[in-house]
From Swiss-Prot:
It is an enzyme of class 3 (hydrolase). This is Nucleoside triphosphate pyrophosphatase. GO terms for molecular function: nucleoside triphosphate diphosphatase activity. GO terms for biological process: nucleotide metabolic process. InterPro entries: ITPase-like_fam, Maf-like. Keywords: Cytoplasm, Hydrolase, Nucleotide metabolism. It comes from Pelagibacter ubique (strain HTCC1062).
């Protein structure tokens, strides 16, 4: 089993998941320009799943080229609402608009992970969760946004599923770690067998 991995992300949520699962790691952010990569892939009309996979691989490979002997973990999550990707909000006004678009609808949250060594992918995994948002009033949506911090708002794709965000949904199907952006059970399985 690998003693330590490199997390190619500065995501506080992903760091927390790894810590809670006793996975030894250090952080080397990839600083990939996700928006331009997404924009380019959307022009090619690829699916949200492919976008998530490609971004996770790009992040892992970029850092893996720098630290060739080490195991590097890249991850990415994408929200697919009716075939359209929902990006993280830049401010509370955008967050409210996103929540209004999701209101009463089901969306898919796609989380991909990639493990690379020597600049190339050696393993990847993608998982999906399906979340159905309650029909909520404008006031309820505004009140929800008032309850969460700016940090949580931007880090969790508008909703913090392990906190206040759970109250937004009438139905949640899928693994909570996937919804939080890191399907850690599969990562742990793979790390047990890798040399």
């Amino acid at each position: 089993m690998v003693k330590e991995i490199i997390l190619a992300s500065k995501s506080g949520v992903r760091k927390k998941i790894l810590e809670e699962n006793n996975i030894q790691f250090r952080v080397e952010p990839s600083n990939v320009d996700e928006d331009s990569v997404k924009e380019s892939l959307l022009k090619e009309k690829v699916t949200p799943t492919i976008i998530s996979k490609n971004l996770a691989e790009l992040k892992a490979n970029k850092i893996s080229q720098k630290f060739t002997e080490e195991i590097v973990l890249g991850a990415d999550s994408v929200i697919d609402l009716e075939g359209k990707i929902i990006s993280k909000p830049n401010d509370r006004e955008e967050a409210l608009e996103i929540l209004k678009r999701m209101n009463g609808k089901t969306h898919q949250l796609i989380s991909s992970v990639c493990i690379s060594r020597g600049g190339s992918m050696i393993w990847n995994y993608t998982d999906k969760a399906s979340l159905t948002m309650k029909n909520m009033t404008f006031l309820e949506l505004e009140n929800y946004l008032k309850k969460i911090s700016d940090k949580d708002l931007y880090a969790y794709n508008v909703y913090q599923i392990e906190g206040e965000g759970r109250n937004l949904f009438s139905k949640i199907e899928g693994d909570e770690d996937t919804i939080m952006g890191l399907p850690v059970k599969k990562i742990k399985e793979y790390l047990k067998i890798i040399k």
